[in-house]
Design a protein with these regions (language model features):
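ATP-dependent adenylate-forming carboxylate-activation enzymes
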Residues: 11, 96-117, 125-130, 154-155, ...
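Conserved pre-ATP/AMP-binding loop-to-beta segment of ANL
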Residues: 20-37, 44, 67-73, 79, ...
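Conserved AMP-binding
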Residues: 32, 77-84, 104, 179, ...
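Conserved AMP-binding/adenylation subdomain of ANL enzymes
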Residues: 46-74, 82-122, 188, 192
Length: 315
């Protein structure tokens, strides 16, 4: 099938519109750029209000991916998934080209790989599930990438080794970050990290304009090698949950380590520790949240829904 666009009709429609810029107030960096819902597969979804500055720090001077006008980004993430933020604004804010990959092409590794080669894609983000499934089938096009990021769940080290053995992308990175911190908070470059003895992939280091604190139960930083809860501060921290003030106050707390008077940090609920080499190691969760195919699932919400059913005494 050939997709086509009637430019003549489009030009007529554009010509009928006013030539002046619309009178839209200038957006401030601390204002919400979009609302993205998370943990909505069960229970009540939470609308995360991500700020403009969070998107800016995601794709500018970020410390992990230098995107230029010569780059080509593949876009195939669902717009309701925060990975699409990187794909969309990574291209638009850097003057790069974005290639929209149809869903049916993504589901066919042969067609997908050929599209990546034909379009000269240089930069791509893949969820862990898709990466694990396609790492071998897409070995050739993946090896030609300038930037390949993968994240959203636990990475299998053996899959990483196979990609590196075939021929790694120039910058091969694992990315970590809740939606509440605007897509990515840390990245870990994998090209020179993995050896035959590696059993886990660290979360890496904070990206640009992002701070990570690992704190104990009293909110104090823990020493190297000691497990604590991961807190994330900086420009990527969301403004809170839409119309959920109590939950916002619980998860977005004042940042006592920042020089900004109103700065806040996000309590991730993830546990980890600093390694001696400055990388963050992930340990697990401090609650009953799990991930299934990259989706955050609150087990307590499932129990509550089951308990609402007639004939169910407890769950």
């Amino acid at each position: 099938d050939v997709q086509w666009l009637d430019l003549g009709h489009a030009l007529e429609a554009v010509a009928s519109l006013p030539a002046d810029n619309p009178g839209v107030p200038k957006a401030e960096c601390a204002e919400a750029a979009y609302v993205m819902y998370t943990s909505g597969s069960t229970g009540q979804p939470k609308g995360v209000m991500a700020p403009h500055r969070g998107v800016n720090r995601l794709v500018f001077a970020n410390g992990y991916a230098d995107i230029t006008p010569e780059d080509v980004l593949a876009h195939f993430s669902n717009p309701a998934f925060d990975g699409s933020t990187f794909e969309t604004w990574g291209a638009l804010l850097n003057g790069a080209r974005v290639v929209i990959v149809p869903q049916e092409t993504v589901l066919d590794p042969v067609r997908f790989g050929q599209l990546l080669l034909d379009e000269g894609v240089t930069t791509m983000f893949m969820t862990i599930g898709l990466f694990h499934q396609y790492a071998d089938a897409l070995a050739e096009p993946l090896s030609r990438l300038k930037h390949l990021l993968t994240g959203g769940d636990v990475i299998e080290p053996n899959t990483i080794r196979r990609v590196l053995k075939y021929g790694a992308p120039e910058n091969f990175m694992a990315a970590y970050g809740p939606t509440e911190t605007t897509t990515f908070a840390t990245t870990c470059r994998l090209n020179d990290l993995i050896d035959e003895g590696s059993q886990k992939i660290p979360l890496g280091r904070p990206i640009g304009n992002t701070q990570v604190y690992i704190l104990d139960g009293q909110g104090e930083p823990v020493p190297i090698g000691v497990t604590g809860e991961i807190h994330i501060g900086g420009d990527g921290v969301a403004l809170g949950y839409l119309n959920r003030p109590e939950l916002t106050a619980e998860r977005f707390i004042p940042d006592p380590f920042s020089d900004e008077p109103d700065a806040r940090m996000y309590r991730t609920g993830d546990l980890g520790y600093w390694r001696a080499d400055g990388l963050i190691e992930f340990v697990g969760r401090n609650d009953f949240q799990v991930k299934v195919r990259g989706f955050r699932i609150e087990l307590g919400e499932i129990e509550a829904r089951l308990a609402e059913l007639s004939g169910v005494r407890d769950a």
